[in-house]
Amino acid sequence: MKLTCVLIVAVLFLTACQLTTAASYARSERQHPDLGSSDQNSKLTKRCLASGETCWRDTSCCSFSCTNNVCF
């Protein structure tokens, strides 16, 4: 019985610690958005390849159609 109570208290304590850490981390992200992932920013600036340009896979073309290394 005592062991069960100790385990329950320990789990509640660890859960509270994780919740406060997650909340402070989210608050920090909002205060400093420029410290976020640069990968996320680079995805916003990538351009797709126009029809007739050389490609290596379908996802790089605007039309998502890459045949014989040419976007269609």
Curated annotation (Swiss-Prot):
The entry's keywords: Cleavage on pair of basic residues, Disulfide bond, Knottin, Neurotoxin, Secreted, Signal, Toxin
Protein name (Swiss-Prot/TrEMBL): Conotoxin VnMKLT2-021
Coiled-coil region list: none
UniProt GO cellular component terms: extracellular region
Compartments reported by the entry: Secreted
Family: Belongs to the conotoxin O1 superfamily.
Signal peptide (from-to): 1-22
Principal location: secreted
Disulphide-bonded residues: C48-C62, C55-C66, C61-C71
Tissue-specific expression: Expressed by the venom duct.
InterPro entries named among the record's database cross-references: Conotoxin
Positions of the propeptide segment: 23-45
Domain comment in the entry: The presence of a 'disulfide through disulfide knot' structurally defines this protein as a knottin. The cysteine framework is VI/VII (C-C-CC-C-C).
A GO molecular-function annotation: ion channel inhibitor activity
